[in-house]
Amino acid sequence: GDTGEDSHSGTATTNQTWEEMQAAALLPFEAGIAAGADVVMAAHITTPNATQDGLPASLSYTMLTERLRGELGFTGVICTDALEMKAISSHYAPADAAVAALNAGADILLMPADLCAAFEGVVQAVETGAVAEERLNESVRRILTLKEKAGLPLGTAAPAEEPTAPEAAEEAVPEKPSACFGWLRALWS
């Protein structure tokens, strides 16, 4: 809204403060959260007067975790806008953008510029501890909970006749995230 730049072609910035954003730009988000929205898409807009990190909202822990989850109370799935957009791909390598988005609190990383590089970057970040396994598991649980709520299968098994409690999604998360990576790695071999 409050920018003349398109994130598809460059860096979009709003100079609004957090309070100004809450008074106008965030009203639809607050209404959606109050109505039970399951997913929020994080834009690649920088907000220098609302956060001091200088990052696009989609890569900002302050914006996604502290503000969206903490202050606004959103508990659903956070999806980034397309990571191949110039606001991200002109400034970050695919692996760096993917790791930053996960550490910021994003659950789904939409369209990285190079999926294989982003995937390998996340795998390496988990293996080295740059992304905590539990952080990745939080995203898996949120996504599985959303799938269960929608009546979608949680894996290769047929969907349950009746949705079960959200605890079922938690049980579906493997002990080690590396167990999830085997089939994905096979795609790139």
Task: Name each model feature, range by range.
Residues 27, 103, 145, 153-155, ...:
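Compositionally biased amphipathic helical and low-complexity segments enriched in hydrophobic
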Residues 1-124, 130-135, 142:
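Second-shell residues forming the walls of enzyme active-site clefts
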Residues 140-147:
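Short amphipathic alpha-helical coiled-coil/interface segments
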Residues 3-5, 148-152:
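Secretory-pathway/luminal and periplasmic proteins that interact with or process carbohydrate-rich
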Residues 162-189:
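C-terminal cell-surface addressing/anchoring modules of secreted/extracellular proteins
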Residues 129-138, 152-157:
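Flexible, glycine/charged-enriched surface loops at secondary-structure junctions
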Residues 150, 161-162:
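Caspase-like cysteine protease fold
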Residues 119, 140, 158-161:
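A glycine-rich phosphate-binding loop feature that marks nucleotide/adenosyl-phosphate handling sites
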